[in-house]
Amino acid sequence: MRPTLLAFLLALGPAAVSAQAAVESAAPTAAHAEVLATIDSFLAGLRTRDTMLMARHVDTLARLTLLRPGPAGSRVMLLSAAQFMRAVSRPDQPALDEPIRNPVVHVDGDLASVWAEYQVRIEGKVSHCGFDAFHLARLGGQWKILNVSDTFRRTGCGDPWP
């Protein structure tokens, strides 16, 4: 039995080293900063209703996957980025401010994901909060948002963040 255990541990060795390398590569890099800058600029466009700025940071096929409460539990709403930008830039709708905090960024080559808390504020008051999950790809040397998924709740959001 001992030779079998030794063989198993030896076989596991490269996988353990590979997993350790993957964890170490999760340390912040220039790509992490670029990904966050892309998201921050997109959210600045949201805050100022600047559809040109928002569009600069999304792929033409980008989607928003929104989980919203419904009578039988969460329901999924899908919007194209174009539909979303039209909706949030309408002059008859209040401007939205959606800061994020505590982002967790993962980058592997040309693919990135970011998980972060968010608050949506309307006229300085917290409307709702939850978590955003962004997926981005580096296309033509630029990070582009492919998808934003979020959760939604109206309670437990706290005061507006600084």
Where are these regions (language model features)?
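Extracytoplasmic
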Residues: 49, 59, 100, 109-111, ...
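Bacterial N-terminal signal peptides
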Residues: 4-15
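A short local loop/turn or secondary-structure capping micro-motif enriched for an aromatic residue
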Residues: 64, 73, 122-124, 138, ...
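Positively charged n-region of N-terminal signal peptides that target proteins for export
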Residues: 1-4, 20
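Short, low-complexity N-terminal intrinsically disordered segments enriched in polar/charged residues
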Residues: 17-52, 56, 60, 78-79, ...
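Short beta-strand edge/turn micro-motifs at domain boundaries
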Residues: 113, 128-156
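Sec/Tat-exported extracytoplasmic proteins
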Residues: 39-50, 58-62, 66, 88, ...
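Surface-exposed, charged secondary-structure patches
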Residues: 63, 67, 75-125
